[in-house]
Amino acid sequence: INAQPLVSVIIPTLNRYIYLKDVMLDLEKQSYKNFDVIVVDQSNPFDADFYNQFKLKLNVIKQDEKLLWTARNRAVRESKADYLLFFDDDSRVGTDWIEQHVKTIDFFKADISAGVSLAVIGGKVPPSYNYFRWADQFDSGNALVNRAVLKKIGLFDLQFNKQSMGDGEFGIRAYINGVKSISNP
C-alpha cells in the first residue's frame, strides 16, 4: 500500500464526553500522522465547544437520531480516506495503534485488520487472539477496513440500529465474500 495512506478514524458517540476526551487525547499522541477523525455526535445536549480543545483534523457531525449503525455509515460517506478505522467512544489505545493497523494491512496484503477489544483496562488478550491469524471476529470498535471492502459488500446493515451485532453481521458478510481479514493482537 501507499506508505502513508490517509486513514479516517470513525467514532460514533452518545452522551459520553467524559470518555471521549481520553479517546481524543490518545489520538493526539499517535505515531502515525496521516489521519483525520470523524465523530458522529448523537449527544443531547450537543457540546460543539468540547472539540475545540483537541489538536486533530476533526470533522464533527451532529446527528439527532440515536442510531449507531446509521452514525457509522454516515461517517463512511463523509470520509475521503481509502482506509477507515472504526473506533468506540470509550476505548483506549497506545501511541502506535494506527501504525500497527496499517502495518498489518500492508504486511499481510489484507483488506481488514481486525483488532481485539478488551472490556477492562489492563485486561489480558485471550491466548487464541494473541497472535496474527485469519480473523474470526470483527469488532467495529477496533478495525481498519479498506474502503474497497465497503464498495464490495456494502455498509453496516441498518436493521441492527436498535440492537448490537451489526459488526458481527458485517464480519460474516465480509467472510462470505472472500474478504481477507487478519486478527491483529
Please give the residue ranges for each predicted region.
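N-proximal low-complexity "stem/linker" segments adjacent to membrane-targeting elements
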Residues: 1-26
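Acidic donor-binding segment of Leloir-type glycosyltransferases
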Residues: 24-62
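Glycine-rich, basic loop-to-helix element that forms the pyrophosphate-binding segment
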Residues: 62-79
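Short aromatic/hydrophobic "clamp" motif used to bind/position activated sugar donors
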Residues: 84
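Conserved donor NDP-sugar-binding/catalytic core segment of glycosyltransferases
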Residues: 96-127
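Catalytic beta-strand/loop signature of glycosyltransferases that borders the donor
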Residues: 181-185
